[in-house]
Curated annotation (Swiss-Prot):
It comes from the Eukaryota. This is Tetraspanning orphan receptor. Phosphorylated on tyrosine residues. Its main location: membrane. PANTHER family: LYSOSOMAL-ASSOCIATED TRANSMEMBRANE PROTEIN. It comes from Schistosoma japonicum (Blood fluke). Residues 50-166, 216-241 are extracellular. It is found in: Cell membrane. Potential vaccine candidate molecule. Residues 306-328 are annotated as: Disordered. The chain crosses the membrane at residues 29-49, 167-187, 195-215, 242-262. Cell surface receptor that binds to human complement C2a protein. This results in inhibition of the classical and lectin pathways of complement activation, probably due to interference with binding of C2a to C4b and interference with cleavage by C1 or MASP2 such that C3 convertase cannot be formed. This infers resistance to complement-mediated cell lysis, allowing parasite survival and infection.
Amino acid sequence: MPRASALLTSDPRHQFTCCLCLHVRTGTIIFGITQIIIQLIFISFLFLMTFNPRLFPEDNHGSLDSSQANARYYVLSALFRLVPAVSDIHESLTFPSFPEVRNVNDNKLLFGHNSESEVNFNFDISSGYKDSVPIDMSHSPSRLMSETHKRERGSREIKIRQFSPYIAVCVTTFSLAFCCFMVHGAITRQPTHLLPFFFIQVFDLIICLIHILGFMSSTSDIRLMIHTKTGPIYIKSTGLAFIILSISCMMLAFKAYCLGMVWDCYKYLMLNRRNNVLNEWYSDQWGHFSTFWSLLRAGRNRGNNLTGNLDSANESNTRAHPDPVTYDPSNDLPKYDDILKIPANAYAPPPYYCSNINGNGNLTQANAVTANTTSTNVSTFTTTTTTANTTTNVTSANKNDAEVTSTPSNVHPC
């Protein structure tokens, strides 16, 4: 992500760094691959629970007198919080259930494994859940179930909601597809491919924030578990709540950081495609990642070939920075010595052009004097007139030279 000090530097490449040493594009690819692995594990876990429920016996799931089982499932809940789009679904796997809640009479239930812990409960079954019925949890089918507990005037109210694991598999599969789409877009420099997973991240961040706020404002299931626990308690409910809240806040900060990293990668790809203001990020600056970056460049080159080599041409233009040509007006003007070496008649018109001009002028004069003569007389008169004009010009030139020569020697020009 961009740092405040990096924004003040002149090198634009330092504006898009994450994890102190990675480029946002490399960080996005690593984050996407990690998410793909976690989601594949989560999908495998759901399939095992769906098709082979005996692998996860329900008598050990969330048992109130088994601290190890509860700790294991709460750790599993913390791991699933790292997966976008399943923050709400994984709660059904990790909430502490009550495996031996059975109907004793209309108003009394046996709670836990000890007959001395009989507590009055009031069932509040919502009409929106058709499958919501009071059941014996020890013989319940393999379904993902979550219980919400709350205190109301000295009594506890249990709302049993049953979820189908197929919905969780579908949602996680869509999230996995969008994550693969994001990795493909980051490798092939397609910025629009990052947007679907980015929106999932935004939605998941909002869900986590609401969950943390709900944990702070209401009685949590962890406090209820500690309050009703029959075995020894080694930690206070306040300390445990503080630990869980701290871990949740750290996960929320991590998700926000990953969200900003994906957004910076999107901005980097858009700037690199539209304006070409960013130079290529070379791996020689970070030698530890040279092998990994060489593999990514191979995929990037294949993506550029599919798009018509448009980006490669832009990169070549960006890398080459030729110096601008300066215009010097003195280079266009010839030197004075070169002009003096040019002969006087160097730019004279060709002879045939001069003869044509003189012939046309004499013909005009002859036509003005002898308009009624024949063509033969016109030709003769033209030749005679040309000779006379030449003689007159020579005489005038000699006369001017004689006048210049006869000028007194004591007269000096001004």
